[in-house]
């Protein structure tokens, strides 16, 4: 029972971390695109 709970908590934390990382990566790409647009104009 305890092993199952630990695995569940680790899995949940991994999924949540992955979502935050993907969102941060998307924002970085957006900022990069804005910088390129400003440099081009």
Curated annotation (Swiss-Prot):
Q: Is Lipoprotein a UniProt keyword of this protein? A: yes
Q: Which UniProt keywords apply?
A: Cell membrane, Lipoprotein, Membrane, Palmitate, Signal
- Signal sequence span is 1-18
**Name under which the protein is recorded:** Entericidin A
Function as written in the Swiss-Prot or TrEMBL entry = Acts as antidote to the effect of entericidin B.
Pfam families (alphabetical): Entericidin
Pull one GO CC term from this UniProt entry. membrane
Gene name as annotated = ecnA
Lipidation sites (N-palmitoyl cysteine): 19
Subcellular locations according to the entry: Cell membrane
Tell me how this protein sits in the membrane. Answer: Lipid-anchor
Lipid-acceptor residues (S-diacylglycerol cysteine): 19
């Amino acid at each position: 029972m305890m092993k199952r709970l630990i695995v569940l908590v680790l899995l949940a934390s991994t999924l949540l971390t992955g979502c935050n990382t993907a969102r941060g990566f998307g924002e970085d790409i957006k900022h990069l695109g804005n910088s390129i647009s400003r440099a081009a104009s």
